[in-house]
């Protein structure tokens, strides 16, 4: 107990000397973090032995001491790596190397020169957020330290990685929470650097252009309203063109909404009804002759299905569905009841013969005949199931492996069928995190998990479609030979902290 107290007091004195000296060298910062590590280890050991107080200092629980010791070890490793770079001779203060500065955005980088950035939402001075822009950002790439400058624009705060802009603050994210109009104003050192911009069409995005004049900065909603008003004025200036189109593109106030298929049926029935009226008017002078002709022609129509009768029946049934039964009928049909009965008998016989044949003539019949014609030409579900069963029984050919782009369903498939369907999609895992973390994970996996994967990709990032800045965190792909291999890999491998993963499939590798 006394030895622990003496050792703890010695570490406290050493820390006080470091704080009083306030040296701005990298060696002094490494010594500071090594002392903090020793203090955390001592407190962990004391708590493990049941000691709850060292002098006037209460001993925290083991989890707290363990977390602080790990933080100190990580900072010592980072500072020792930075000591081997060309930036070791620069001035480094306790603030520059503190854990709070290291973990602030952008996380996992050393930073210097904080600059306050104020963002005002909706032109309301009380509705504002403060951000920190770092003048210099030190990051590691391919085990080499780089120094980059930060900048700010209407989109957010970024630092340059070569020619790419890496945004570590995006104003649009907070605008969704704090802004009602989606507009904000950016101020640096209380000076306005960007006038109010909108989140709907930010300058530089594919949907808008960055204008320098404040008068031309209008929202997308206003532009869309002006365009729609212009279209309405143009339409009202051309009433004849609207009346010519008729009910094809518009609808009467009293009519109900119809689907596009119903519009196509009406246009076809209007054309066929006009032909039917022209024929019926030419035959309206001799109803007795037409009745006799129908009587003598009906047996042959039931056997051969002449296209004339099918055309007349198609026009009547289509016009009856469209709600214009009186227009499609000829004026002479009401003159003879006997003729109407004969025509209905001929229509019934023709429909029966047409349904028995199942040919193209069935498409022009009544609604039921049309549905029967379509269902006969399509593949039944039983045929689909039998075809899929035959594919599963035959297996997957080598040229078909990796061709499917759909995810495999877990329903109605046995184990063999699922394995065969999974062979069509080479599985992958997409991991997201810091570039250095992903590279270390890849190097460690090559040693510890050899045989549990197929290959690793290099780290990569998405690039904006209208610029060269990188979007989001770096990514890396891990490919596998089978789904079982990916499952085994996922069960065994322990991913680093802060790394996210998602599953996917590729057409080919």
Curated annotation (Swiss-Prot):
Polar residues: bias regions: 232-243
Composition bias, Basic residues: 247-282, 311-329
Bias type Gly residues, positions: 355-368
Pfam family membership, one: PPV_E2_C
Location relative to the cell: Host nucleus
Any single GO CC term annotated in Swiss-Prot or TrEMBL for this entry: host cell nucleus
One Gene Ontology term from the biological process aspect of the record: viral DNA genome replication
MF terms (GO), sorted A to Z: DNA binding; DNA-binding transcription factor activity; nucleotide binding
Record key words, sorted: Activator, DNA replication, DNA-binding, Early protein, Host nucleus, Phosphoprotein, Repressor, Transcription, Transcription regulation
Start and end residues of each stretch annotated as Transactivation domain: 1-200
Its job: Plays a role in the initiation of viral DNA replication. A dimer of E2 interacts with a dimer of E1 in order to improve specificity of E1 DNA binding activity. Once the complex recognizes and binds DNA at specific sites, the E2 dimer is removed from DNA. E2 also regulates viral transcription through binding to the E2RE response element (5'-ACCNNNNNNGGT-3') present in multiple copies in the regulatory regions of the viral genome. Activates or represses transcription depending on E2RE's position with regards to proximal promoter elements including the TATA-box.
Quaternary organization: Binds DNA as homodimer. Interacts with protein E1; this interaction greatly increases E1 DNA-binding activity. Interacts with protein L1; this interaction enhances E2-dependent replication and transcription activation. Interacts with protein L2; this interaction inhibits E2 transcriptional activity but not DNA replication function E2. Interacts with protein E7; this interaction inhibits E7 oncogenic activity. Interacts with host TAF1; this interaction modulates E2-dependent transcriptional regulation. Interacts with host BRD4; this interaction mediates E2 transcriptional activation function.
Protein name: Regulatory protein E2
Organism: Human papillomavirus 36
Lineage, broadest ranks: Viruses, Monodnaviria, Shotokuvirae, Cossaviricota, Papovaviricetes
The encoding gene: E2
């Amino acid at each position: 107990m006394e030895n622990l107290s003496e050792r703890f007091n010695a570490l406290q004195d050493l820390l006080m000397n470091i704080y009083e000296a306030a040296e701005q060298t990298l060696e002094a910062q490494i010594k500071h973090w090594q002392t903090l590590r020793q203090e955390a280890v001592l407190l962990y050991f004391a708590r493990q032995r049941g000691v709850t107080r060292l002098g006037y200092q209460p001993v925290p629980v083991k989890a707290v001491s363990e977390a602080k010791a790990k933080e100190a070890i990580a900072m010592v490793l980072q500072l020792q790596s930075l000591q081997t770079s060309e930036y070791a001779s620069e001035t480094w203060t306790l603030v520059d190397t503190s854990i709070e500065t290291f973990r602030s955005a952008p996380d996992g980088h050393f930073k210097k020169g904080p600059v306050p950035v104020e963002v005002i939402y909706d032109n309301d001075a009380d509705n504002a957020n403060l951000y920190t822009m770092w003048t210099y950002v030190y990051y590691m790439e391919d085990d080499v330290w780089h120094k980059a400058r930060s900048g700010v624009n209407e989109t957010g705060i970024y630092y340059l990685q070569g020619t790419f802009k890496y945004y570590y603050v995006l104003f649009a994210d907070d605008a969704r929470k704090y802004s009602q109009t989606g507009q904000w104003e950016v101020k640096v050192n209380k000076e306005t650097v960007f006038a109010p911009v909108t989140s709907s069409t930010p300058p530089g995005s594919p949907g808008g252009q960055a204008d320098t004049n404040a008068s031309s900065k209008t929202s997308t909603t206003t532009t869309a309203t002006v365009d729609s008003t212009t279209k309405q004025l143009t339409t009202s200036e051309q009433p004849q063109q609207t009346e010519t189109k008729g009910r094809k593109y518009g609808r009467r106030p009293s009519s109900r909404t119809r689907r596009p298929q119903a519009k196509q049926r009406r246009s076809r029935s209007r054309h066929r009804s006009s032909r039917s009226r022209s024929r019926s008017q030419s035959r309206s002078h001799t109803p007795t002759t037409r009745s006799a002709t129908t009587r003598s022609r009906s047996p042959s129509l039931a056997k051969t299905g002449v296209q004339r009768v099918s055309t007349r029946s198609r026009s009547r049934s289509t016009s009856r569905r469209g709600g214009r039964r009186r227009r499609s009928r000829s004026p002479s049909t009401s003159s003879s009841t006997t003729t109407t009965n004969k025509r209905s008998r001929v229509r019934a016989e023709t429909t029966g013969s047409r349904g028995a044949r199942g040919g193209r003539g069935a498409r022009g019949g009544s609604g039921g005949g049309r549905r029967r014609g379509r269902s006969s030409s399509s593949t039944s579900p039983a045929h689909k199931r039998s075809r899929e069963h035959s594919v599963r029984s035959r297996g997957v050919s080598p040229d078909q492996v990796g061709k499917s782009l759909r995810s495999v369903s877990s329903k109605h498939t046995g184990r063999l069928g699922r394995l065969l369907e999974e062979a069509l999609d080479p599985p992958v895992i997409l991991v997201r995190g810091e570039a250095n973390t992903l590279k270390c994970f890849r190097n460690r996996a090559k040693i510890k998990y050899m045989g549990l994967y197929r290959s690793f990709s290099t780290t990569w990032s998405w690039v904006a479609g209208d610029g060269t800045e990188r979007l989001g965190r770096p990514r890396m792909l891990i490919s596998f030979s089978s789904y079982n291999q990916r499952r085994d890999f996922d069960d065994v491998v322990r991913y680093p902290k802060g790394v996210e993963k998602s599953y996917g499939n590729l057409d080919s590798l």
